[in-house]
Design a protein with these regions (language model features):
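Terminal, non-globular segments
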Residues: 1-169
Length: 169
């Protein structure tokens, strides 16, 4: 919907609500982990992380630099991971994306996807090191979860792009 196609009396999204929308979508993504899924292997991708990375890569100014710490705390409280693990890992991933973004300048979606793949792999491997003993044999399942998460990133990015378009109108 373009600005010309908007109905004449439709109110635009308020400034406070427009700033709250990225936070709310990441929190809703983190809420996916509490849904009753029937699975024998933990292959559910971290939807909150995917949406957080999508917001950072598609609309860099939508979230502040300190936002991953609070959103990671929310995710830790819901997912059952050790408290502070997502806070630390999401913040470090956000800084990693910031550093790569500062060095690369202009990028296309394939490069954003590669940056997200690096960040997703970093967070999931870091979460495995924090949450499970080193002698636990979960590496093949973790690799499969990383692959699924990286393959689902374009869907999360498309959702965030659609939400950001609606937020702008």
């Amino acid at each position: 919907m373009t600005l010309a196609a908007r109905p004449p009396f439709e109110e635009p999204l308020g400034r406070g609500r427009a700033r709250l929308l990225p936070w709310a979508t990441v929190m809703v993504g983190s809420l996916v982990t509490i849904l009753p899924w029937s699975a024998t292997l933990p292959l559910l991708p971290p939807a909150g992380l995917l949406i957080l990375l999508s917001w950072r890569l598609l609309a860099p100014l939508s979230l502040r630099v300190w936002a991953p710490a609070l959103l990671g705390l929310f995710d830790d409280l819901l997912s059952g991971q050790p408290l502070g693990s997502a806070m630390l890992l999401w913040t470090l991933a956000f800084f990693l994306v910031e550093a790569i973004d500062a060095r690369s300048g202009v990028r296309d979606f394939k490069q954003s996807w590669a940056i997200a793949a690096i960040a997703i792999g970093f967070v999931l491997v870091g979460g495995r090191l924090v949450a499970t003993p080193l002698d636990a044999h979960v590496d093949s399942v973790l690799l499969l979860q990383i692959v699924i998460s990286v393959l689902l990133f374009p869907a999360a990015a498309r959702l965030v792009a659609w939400i950001d378009l609606r937020r702008a109108l």
